[in-house]
Amino acid sequence: GQDGYLRPEYVERINGIDSIIKNSDPRVQRFSGYDQLNFLQKIRFKPNENWNLQYSFAYAKTGDAPRYDRLIQYRNGALRFAEWYYGPMKWNMHNLQILHSKKTSIYDDARLTVAYQDYEESRIDRTRANNNRNRQVELVDAISANWDATKTVGKGEIFYGLEYVHNKVGSFGERTNIS
């Protein structure tokens, strides 16, 4: 790889003081890993030939993910950041689909999909020799409902539907003195 991505040294906080430590192997990207968990559950219920109900739940979470390109930045000949990482990302989604396949006066097939998503992510940074840790958090709640239908009319087919989407987005920042 490029020499610019080597890590000859890194910052470690020892007894409340940011200390620059020589890396025994500059090719090792110290403190650059993260963990991740994903989960998916699906359930289907078909009580008869006309109705089909499906529910799914998805969940994902990561641990802290260091921003390696920021942790190797220099300013005035010394490492700029003591900390720079993405905080845990959390996401979950509930999704319910109901399909009705029976000819009525207004449709031949209709599908209702209702979903809810909850998402959170954050960014944390602290410059070297500074006791203030900055944390920026983003929160998103998303609700949606969609109804689609088809109807055969003579030799043609009509497709129509309705949709509602509501996103609530929030963001806040905080500064914490770590000393």
Model-based region annotation:
Residues 21-27, 37, 76-83, 93-94, ...:
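Extracytoplasmic loops and strand-loop junctions of Gram-negative outer membrane beta-barrel proteins
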Residues 1-65, 90-91:
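Transmembrane beta-barrel wall of Gram-negative outer-membrane proteins
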Residues 2-16, 69-79, 126-135, 174-179:
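Flexible, surface-exposed loop regions and adjacent strand-edge segments
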Residues 85-87:
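Structural alpha/beta core scaffold segments of enzyme domains
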